[in-house]
Swiss-Prot record:
Cofactors demanded by this protein: [4Fe-4S] cluster
Subcellular location: Cytoplasm
Species assigned in the record: Anaeromyxobacter dehalogenans (strain 2CP-C)
SUPFAM superfamilies: Radical SAM enzymes
Gene for this chain: lipA
PANTHER family xrefs: LIPOYL SYNTHASE, LIPOYL SYNTHASE, MITOCHONDRIAL
Protein name, as recorded: Lipoyl synthase
EC code: 2.8.1.8
GO cellular component: cytoplasm
Pathway: Protein modification; protein lipoylation via endogenous pathway; protein N(6)-(lipoyl)lysine from octanoyl-[acyl-carrier-protein]: step 2/2
């Protein structure tokens, strides 16, 4: 398909004082962001609001998912042991109260980078008042790696299902499977019940509505509490084409179906991404309510 984008996919041009401050601070501290690396359409809204999704473990991924614009290689550069410290310094300088930390996949590392991720979480948690959401790799489903991240006590743990079961082999790298993602999410909720669990689905890749609802049910059955759904947008001619531009009305219907299935919050819209600011605002209130003394 990939015809002309509909009007509801127009985005704001990045700008503003807060946007520039976030951009320059992250650039100065040599931190990679999904906002820039993946050409996120919400960069103006998020950076302008003083938040960002920061990417750990470099900007080269060991997987080649057919929807993703991040660079790939079998053997990326070695990890920078100072990266967690640099990250905490950047967030402290920006004065944020909520940060989303994600990463590339690092299948070349024995633990998939779990210890590096956990180090970053612990350093960030030392910043007073900061809530930490992590969007991690699946660590090839390794329970020990998932446990390492859980023990670092993130406030929110996300791992993205990305698409429906039928399309997973065509959309995601062969190392990533539908059930592996569900297993990682289930383990986190089972072993660390205080951590809010979250996942995301892209639509417009040729899925059927019933398949999206089935994926929602699978996520709920594995303890996922927060769901985001957004339109797949093709990053380049080398990536999967858009099969359909899903209407705002259908996104609204997906939201209603998700809430009926028991998700505590569903962000569903054409420009929604997994690290979506509206979901962040809900999560902040949710976490604070869980931690208040009763």
């Amino acid at each position: 398909m990939d015809a002309k984008k509909p009007s509801w996919l127009r985005v704001n041009v990045p700008g503003g004082e807060r946007y520039q401050k976030v951009r320059e601070t992250l650039k100065g501290l040599q931190l990679h962001t999904v906002c820039a690396e993946a050409h996120c359409p919400n960069v103006a809204e998020c950076w302008g609001g003083g938040t960002a999704t920061v990417m750990l473990m470099g900007d080269v991924c060991t997987r080649g998912c057919r929807f993703c614009n991040v660079k790939t290689a079998a053997h990326p550069p070695a990890l920078d042991p100072d990266e967690p410290r640099h990250l905490a310094a950047a967030i402290a300088e920006l004065g944020l109260d909520y940060i989303v930390v994600t990463s590339v996949d690092r299948d070349d590392l024995p633990d998939g980078g779990a210890a590096h991720f956990a180090d970053a979480i612990r350093r960030l948690k030392e910043i007073p008042g900061l809530l930490v959401e992590v969007l991690t790799p699946d660590f090839r489903g390794d329970p020990a790696a998932v446990r390492t991240v859980g023990r670092a006590a993130p406030d929110v743990f996300a791992n993205n299902l990305e698409t429906v079961r039928r399309l997973t082999p065509a959309v995601r790298d062969a190392k990533a499977t539908y059930d592996q993602t569900l297993g990682v999410l289930a383990q986190m909720k089972r072993e660390f019940p205080q951590v809010v669990t979250k996942s995301s689905i892209m639509v417009g890749l040729g899925e059927q509505e019933a398949e999206v609802v089935e994926a929602m049910r699978d996520l709920r059955a594995n303890g996922v509490e927060i769901l985001t759904l957004g339109q797949y947008l093709r990053p380049s001619a080398w990536h999967l084409p858009v099969v359909e531009y899903v209407s705002p009305e259908r996104f609204a219907a997906y939201r209603d179906q998700g809430l009926a299935l028991g998700f505590r919050y569903v962000a569903s819209g054409p420009l929604v991404r997994s690290s979506y600011r509206a979901a962040e605002l809900f999560l902040r209130g949710e976490i604070e309510s869980r931690t208040k003394p009763r």
